[in-house]
């Protein structure tokens, strides 16, 4: 058996495959990504609105060291340079410093992994609330209210409340999902009885047999 990571384009802040009260969250919530429009048009509008090249020059990409995100930062920089002739500096800091700066909002753009611990949609979204850790320093009364309501709701109602929270984060550009990583287990033919929890990760071979 061999655990591998699968990387795919993000369809939202919450990855595919997670359930809420046994309901497929993504299928029920639908696509909550906002339509921001053409990037070049947005750039021109910002430039015409008074944002100078020197303002863009002060933008930096913050990422935690040892996270494996350096290549992603290079790809982003390459795309910006090609499309807009912009090049942003990359600032790589220790994980502890990275977390501290995320929480107090001391950054312009940060490449941060967002995890759904235990496969919980609520836990993933709660990270952006003050009570759940205050990831990115985000604080909003409506977000907190809907997230709190989802904790006591059930079924499709709970999905709708969580989807509203996810939509709000994306519409306000608190977070912009780039890609998802999901762990899968490759198993040789004939192996049965393995129990694999990708969120642990835990591999239980107690009842494993080979046919």
Where are the regions that the model predicts?
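Structured segments of extracytoplasmic/periplasmic soluble domains
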Residues: 1, 5, 42-49, 79-86, ...
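Structural transition elements
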Residues: 3-48, 68-71
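Solvent-exposed loop/turn segments at secondary-structure junctions
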Residues: 6-8, 18-21, 65-69, 96-97, ...
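Short, solvent-exposed loop/beta-turn-alpha elements that line the ligand-binding surface or hinge
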Residues: 19-38, 51-54, 101-105, 123-149, ...
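Ligand/substrate-recognition segments at binding pockets and active sites
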Residues: 44-116
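Small-molecule-sensing regulatory modules
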Residues: 71-75, 81, 87, 97-100, ...
